[in-house]
Every structure is written in structure tokens, then in C-alpha cells.
């Protein structure tokens, strides 16, 4: 049986893609009323604006009303995934090659559960990170969560835009 988050993902992802957005994360919290949090990013690398979030929110709201997946009243929150966005799909790692990432693992790897480094490559369900002076190979299935890191280099690029 799929979780409510998976069900919501299934019914909204294609529409968001058609609008030029990547569905980054769906989270349902609370009881009465439930809060449906949705994080989006731009497929073309541009910044997500308030108008983008409003457009996406209207579309998602209409779909959720038709699909009737959530039984009681709920609040819908649509936001940009942000500069330190979560990496929740394997494909995300290839999109953000050479970017700094923080990774938390489900279990120990080389005596550690946390790694931070630059993504070198992602292939065959493995993530290759450059951590300080060594390369670390992480099986994607071991990753509990991962987020991009806002570095000085990224910040400077943003200022130039």
C-alpha cells in the first residue's frame, strides 16, 4: 500500500513537470487540519518565484480536489526547495555534479553515518563523493537524507545573476 505522500506524488508530478517544475518533496503533517507541504524546483535551473509557487499551488489544489485523496480538511503549502534543497531521487545527484552535499546514512559506512563533500559522479546506484582528500563511494540505498550545501562559490554565482 502506498503512503499518502506517494499517492499525491503520483497524481501531481506529471502536471508539475508539464509546467516546468520538478516535484522535489511531498510531506503530509498534522492531524486536524492536515498540512500538505510540497517543495518544487525549476527544471531549467532558474529561481522559483512566489508567482511560480502560486501557479503550482492552484494546479495541485485542483488535482487534489478531484482525486479526493485527503479525507478531512487540509492546508496546502507550496514552496521553493531552496538553496540547500533535499536530494530525494538518484537522478538529482547527476543534476548537481560538482556541488557540495551533506549526506546522512541509515547505517555506518567506514565508521561514520554523516558525510560532506562534492558529488563527483552518480552511476549504478552509487554516489561518488570527494570528501577532503579522499573519495567515498556510497550506495544510494544507504542514504537516509541528503541536502545541497550553500557554499561561498554558490553564493557568489547567485549574486552575479
Curated annotation (Swiss-Prot):
Keyword terms, alphabetized: Cytoplasm, Ribosome biogenesis
Name of the protein: Ribosome maturation factor RimP
Family in the record: Belongs to the RimP family.
GO CC terms of this entry: cytosol
NCBIfam families in the cross-refs: PRK00092.4-3
This protein's record includes keyword Cytoplasm: yes
Predominant cellular place of this UniProt entry's protein: cytoplasm
Pfam families hit by this protein: DUF150_C, RimP_N
Signal peptide location: none
Annotated function: Required for maturation of 30S ribosomal subunits.
One of the protein's GO biological processes: ribosomal small subunit assembly
InterPro entries in the cross-refs: Ribosome_maturation_RimP (IPR003728), RimP_C (IPR028998), RimP_C_sf (IPR036847), RimP_N (IPR028989), RimP_N_sf (IPR035956)
Amino acid at each position: 500500500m502506498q503512503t499518502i505522500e506517494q499517492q499525491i506524488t503520483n497524481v501531481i508530478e506529471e502536471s508539475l513537470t508539464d509546467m516546468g517544475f520538478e516535484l522535489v518533496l511531498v510531506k503530509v503533517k498534522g492531524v486536524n487540519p492536515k498540512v500538505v507541504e510540497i517543495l518544487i524546483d525549476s527544471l531549467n535551473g532558474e529561481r522559483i518565484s512566489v508567482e511560480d509557487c502560486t501557479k503550482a499551488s492552484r494546479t495541485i489544489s485542483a488535482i487534489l480536489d478531484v482525486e479526493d485523496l485527503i479525507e478531512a480538511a487540509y492546508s496546502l503549502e507550496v514552496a521553493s526547495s531552496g538553496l540547500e534543497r533535499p536530494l530525494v531521487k538518484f537522478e538529482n545527484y547527476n543534476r548537481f555534479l560538482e556541488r557540495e552535499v551533506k549526506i546522512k546514512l541509515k547505517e555506518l559506512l567506514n565508521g561514520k553515518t554523516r558525510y560532506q563533500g562534492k558529488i563527483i559522479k552518480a552511476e549504478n546506484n552509487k554516489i561518488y563523493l570527494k570528501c577532503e582528500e579522499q573519495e567515498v563511494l556510497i550506495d544510494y540505498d544507504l542514504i537516509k537524507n541528503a541536502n545541497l550545501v550553500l557554499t561561498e562559490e554558490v553564493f557568489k554565482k547567485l549574486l552575479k545573476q
